[in-house]
Amino acid sequence: MPRVKGERRLEILKALAQMLEQPKWGKITTAALAEKLDVSEAALYRHFASKAQMYEGLIEFIENSVFTLSNKIAQDETDGRKQASKLVEMLLAFAEKNPGMVRVMTGDALVGEHERLQARMNQFY
């Protein structure tokens, strides 16, 4: 059965996020990511021009998820204190559900990667 367009790309991002969840992983190499997926490094680069683009994919997921939930909270709750409380709860729940993404959000996973990644994550805050 043929793959749905973008399916492999999503698999790559999920594998990268899973690797980021493991404390033993420092800087993740494309070789290690390819090995986890049982594909060649060249296969990774058919879907992403660079490792930086893979991290950008994770950042886009973070932005889309958090901003969508934040906007819903802002629409549903008019009291500022309750909004703030719900925003904190949402961020903590997101972090608990996506521990690998926390390393991206804090910049830990981006150390030694392209500077634009850290700059983009800084804009998030």
Language model regions located:
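Basic, helix-initiating cap at the start of DNA-binding domains
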Residues: M1-P23, K27-K36, Q53-E56, S65
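Amphipathic alpha-helical packing segments from all-alpha helical-bundle domains
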Residues: N64-F67, N71, E115-Y125
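Hydrophobic alpha-helical connector segments
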Residues: G57, N71-K97
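Short, structured helix-loop boundary elements
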Residues: R9-L10, T30, A52, E56, ...
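Short hydrophobic/aromatic patch on the recognition helix
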Residues: D38-F48
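Amphipathic alpha-helical segments used for helix-helix packing
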Residues: E96-R116
